Amino acid sequence: MTAIHPTATRAYLTLPYAYTLAQELSASERQPLHQRKREPLAAAVLAAVHAVGYAVPTVQHWRDLADAANLSETLLGMGVFTEPEAQSLFADAVAAVVDLGRKHGHGQEMRLNAVQLGHLVEFGEAYGQVLEVIPARTFIRAHRATERRLRELLVNSHGSDTHEFIVV
């Protein structure tokens, strides 16, 4: 079992971003990510949801869910989704993913109650749909902004009680 560490080392801050600014600027403003890029992302989230609900979830499943939840949170902040239902769905998914991480950190099984699992199932389906419709440039911009936001939180929130960091 991989341990959850409450803090991240500064080495995390020196890792390269997944996408470069050049990739962001050259990505399509109208077309979504290519199918070969978005399908593995959507499939990983659906596999993680399935593992949480019906199998034995691993740390990698949690990471896939956390990545999707963090990216969705950034997309909400960018104003990509303005519908209250979408905002509620993504907020519920983030809460469920945090709960899974806490449970793992305390040596408990990564399981959710029926309501949380329902939110996570909805989120998994919605995430795949989002990837099919948002332009590639928006996705890459959100991905870069998410990485930047998480790094800033790690640097600026040392000793803060406002954020809980679960790094696995």
Residue spans for each PLM region:
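Short, low-complexity cationic-aromatic patches
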Residues: 51-64, 105-122
